[in-house]
Amino acid sequence: MSLQRRTTLTKYLIEQQRENNNLPADLRLLIEVVARACKAISYHVSKGALGDALGTAGSENVQGEVQKKLDILSNEILLEANEWGGNLAGMASEEMEQFFPIPANYPKGEYLLVFDPLDGSSNIDVNVSIGTIFSVLRCPDGQQPTEQSFLQKGTQQVAAGYAVYGPQTVLVLTTGNGVNCFTLDRELGSWVLTQSDMRIPVETREYAINASNQRHWYEPVQQYIGELNAGKDGPRQADFNMRWIASMVADVHRILNRGGIFMYPADKRDPSKPGKLRLMYEANPMSFIVEQAGGAATNGEKRILDIQPKSLHERVAVFLGSKNEVDRVTRYHLEKKS
């Protein structure tokens, strides 16, 4: 009986290292460690109430958001998995106010890892897809990073990815050479390549936005959504469907597969905040992935990957997905500004 040939994450990364000479061995090892940590997080997520990890932890993170037990556990899993491998100079997380330097008793490497350990955690208790988002940067200051070391434009990312913990657990990854999706084989414990060179359809009839905030949106977003909702009788002469999961990884994963636009705009409630999503560990890695898949990502005025971060937990408006739609809503913002 012949065995079905399957490409695992390890095999894929080694082949990339051999063929392109643009994937250093220590970056390959770092990605594999992050992937193993995502497997561990997936296990704890799948236990649900049986694992005593549901509910809140009685604390808040630096964003002022109530932490779930799984938020804290996922953060600890990623820290512990990556601190001793010798590939990193430091890490930063949504759940920590300051960056995490590699302890002195461990070897250090040339990379920085930035992550949202459990995106969409408000959905944990109701069993809706959640995930992990991560970004890898080179440390410009050798092995002794400061917070400034992390504040690099998204164009400087050397790898980015996300895991979705849903009906299947999948890992979507880019190292700057296209986007690939791996599905976790729970029986064998390995990530198996299931989608190669993913591409976002240019034309789309779906969009994702939290419509409950409509009364707070600025005029360019009101105009754009108004056109979509007008359907065949409106200026777009087509019917559009809205989908909103309230989990960025789930919404973006759907768009990556089916096309569409994901929007989390700034609004009038707090003009001092340019948006809700964090630039370093949400918008940047997702924008890198989307652009590698042929899509686009802006903050309404400029390409997200060109934004110079000013702080570790900086927020930004996000419009990403199928290029034609992102270009249109960005044009509305620029026309209003001018």
Swiss-Prot record:
Family classification: Belongs to the FBPase class 1 family.
EC top class named in words: hydrolase
Protein name per UniProt: Fructose-1,6-bisphosphatase class 1 1
Positions contributing to Mg(2+) 2 binding: D116, D119, E282
Gene from which this protein is expressed: fbp1
Pathway noted in the entry: Carbohydrate biosynthesis; gluconeogenesis
GO cellular component, one term: cytosol
Cofactor(s) needed by this chain: Mg(2+)
Keywords associated with the record: Carbohydrate metabolism, Cytoplasm, Hydrolase, Magnesium, Metal-binding
EC number: 3.1.3.11
HAMAP family cross-referenced by the UniProt entry: FBPase_class1 (MF_01855)
GO terms assigned for molecular function: fructose 1,6-bisphosphate 1-phosphatase activity; magnesium ion binding
Lineage: Bacteria, Pseudomonadati, Pseudomonadota, Betaproteobacteria, Burkholderiales
Superkingdom of the source species: Bacteria
